[in-house]
Amino acid sequence: MANTPSAKKAVRKIERRTAINKSRRSQMRTYIRKVEEAIASGDAAAATSALQSAAPLVMRAAQKGIVHKNTASRKVSRLSKRVKALA
């Protein structure tokens, strides 16, 4: 347990950041899932629009340090490759 005032404040800050990061990670996964569902259904137009909304979110998550930038790039690259294969 944190004893000093600065340690207690650090715990509060970490809890806030953790909640924000969890929310962003969850949102990113939801958008990726929407793209994958559109790909699975074979709807090229829906997959393209879903990818256009998901890609910036994934890259923003990388900028915020939620996922590594290479991981984000890999996810976007693989999704776009699958979407292009539909067209």
From Swiss-Prot:
GO terms for biological process: translation. It comes from the Bacteria. It comes from Beijerinckia indica subsp. indica (strain ATCC 9039 / DSM 1715 / NCIMB 8712). This is Small ribosomal subunit protein bS20. Belongs to the bacterial ribosomal protein bS20 family. Binds directly to 16S ribosomal RNA. Keywords: Ribonucleoprotein, Ribosomal protein, RNA-binding, rRNA-binding. Disulfide bonds: none annotated. InterPro entries: Ribosomal_bS20, Ribosomal_bS20_sf. One of its GO terms (molecular function) is small ribosomal subunit rRNA binding. One of its GO terms (cellular component) is cytosol.
